[in-house]
C-alpha cells in the first residue's frame, strides 16, 4: 500500500501516493470500524449526517490496482459519486451500478446537490431536493446518501468522508467557472471513469414533456387537475376539454367500426359455412335422386321387375303341343270330340249351306263307325 505523507500533495491540496510499496504495518493489523456495504435491501440507504464514518483507524490511500485486487472485509473501498439526479431514471441507476461494481469490496457514497446550488449553476429542477434525496436512498446500489453535496469537491470534504475514489463519466464537466470540475480529482489519481447511458437523460425526458405539452395537459385535465394547477388559461382549458370530447367521440366511432367489422366478418364466416353445407347437401340430394330415378336407378329396376311380374301373371306361358307319337296317359280319358251341330231353331241361310252341313255330319258318322 502506498505511503502517504503530508508533503506529497498536489496543487489542490489532495494527497498523492508516493510509491506502491507496502508500509511496514499491513492493513489486516489495523482494526477498522467503517460502515459496511448493505447486505439487505429491506430498508433504504442511510444519510451520511445520520450515520457517518466514525472509524478512528488511519485511512491510508489506495491505488486503483490495490483496490481492484481486493481489501479486507472491514476496510471497504469508499467510492463517491455525485450528481443532481432529477427525475431519477435508468441512466442514473446504471451509472451507480458501475460505480458500485468498480471494485470487489466497495462502499458507495452518493452526493446530491441542494436546490440552491443546482438552480444557481445548472437550472431549475422538476423535483425538489427532498424528493431527489429519497429517490437515491431507494436505489439498490447506494450504501449512503450525502445531502447538500458541494458543487466542487474540496480536500476537506474528501477527508471528512474518507473517500478513496470518485466515479463519474469521463466527459469534461464545465461549470462554476471551470472547464472541468473533476480536473483536480483526475490529477490526484482518484478519478475512475464510468460510461454514460446513451438515449436517456433528464433533459431528454423534459424535452418529451415540453414537445407533447398539449397531450399531457389534456391528460391531467381529464384526470381531475384544475386549470389553475396546470397553469392553463381559460381558453386553453376549454379547448383541451373540447379536444377530449372529440377524442372520446372518435374512440367510440372507432370502437363501433371495429365491432361492425367483427360482426361482418362473423356473418361472412357463417354464410361461407352455410354455403358450404348447402352445397354438400345439394350434392348429396342430387346423388340420391340419381340413384333412385337415374337411367340405371333403383326405381327403374323396381318398376321393370314389377311390370314383368304383372305381365307374367296376366299372360302365363302356354305348354308345348304333344307330338303324335307320344302315347296318352291311361289315367286320363280322351277328351270328347265335339261336333258343331246346326242350331235347330235357326234354319240354314241357304240350300247350299244346308247340304254342306248334312254332308259333314254324314262324314263324321262314318268315321265313328
Curated annotation (Swiss-Prot):
Catalysis: reaction(s): phosphocholine + CTP + H(+) = CDP-choline + diphosphate
InterPro entries from the UniProt entry: CCT, Cyt_trans-like, Pcy1-like, Rossmann-like_a/b/a_fold
Subcellular location: Endoplasmic reticulum; Cytoplasm
Residues spanning the membrane: none
Annotated positions binding phosphocholine: 122, 151
Biological processes annotated in GO: CDP-choline pathway; ovarian follicle development; phosphatidylcholine biosynthetic process; response to vasopressin; spermatogenesis
Region (Disordered): 1-27, 309-369
Chain's role: Catalyzes the key rate-limiting step in the CDP-choline pathway for phosphatidylcholine biosynthesis.
Protein name: Choline-phosphate cytidylyltransferase B
Organism whose genome encodes this protein: Rattus norvegicus
Gene assigned in the entry: Pcyt1b
